[in-house]
Amino acid sequence: MVYVLSRSVAIALTGGRRAVLRPLGVAAAALAATGYVAVVDPNAAGHYPTCPFLAITGWYCPGCGALRAVHALAHGDLMTALARNPFAVVALGYLVVAWVLWLHRTATGRPRRWLAPPWVLYSALGAILMFWVLRNVPGWTWLSPA
């Protein structure tokens, strides 16, 4: 049995100080990648590879336009980001919230919860599939990244 005298001791016992390095490392990598996308414009030809799904089928995948959306967000242009890939903008917001919760749980020594409940995962999968289909249907061109 472990007796905990204070919260700081609890963090030390659970490895909280070292464990916090993981979410901070993920944040550093995400910020570095965002910085690169902010500097190297994905709207200019030749900087990034073409989407293989788009190249093979001629249809947009759910990720098409995500780099351009991140580029626009990095420059503070929310409307352009939403025009390029609205799903990516919403997903990035969710990832930021999930990261904050991960950091908080790690810093306070609470156990990690990696998976959401099944209904959330199935709903997300359904939303991705629906977005994928609708952005390629005539009349829904406002979802295309062009």
Language model feature labels by segment:
Residues 45-83:
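Extracytosolic (periplasmic/ER-lumenal) interhelical loops and adjacent juxtamembrane/interface segments
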Residues 1-26:
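Polybasic, low-complexity association/targeting segments
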Residues 8-10, 42-49:
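Short Cys/His-rich Zn2+-coordinating modules
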Residues 47-52, 81-86, 113-116, 143-146:
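Non-cytosolic membrane-interface motifs at loop->transmembrane helix junctions
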Residues 132-146:
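Juxtamembrane boundary at the C-terminal end of a transmembrane helix
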Residues 18-36, 82-113:
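Short Fe-S-cluster ligation motifs
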Residues 31-38, 128-136:
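Aromatic-anchored segments of alpha-helical transmembrane domains
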Residues 111-127:
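Interfacial loop-to-transmembrane junctions
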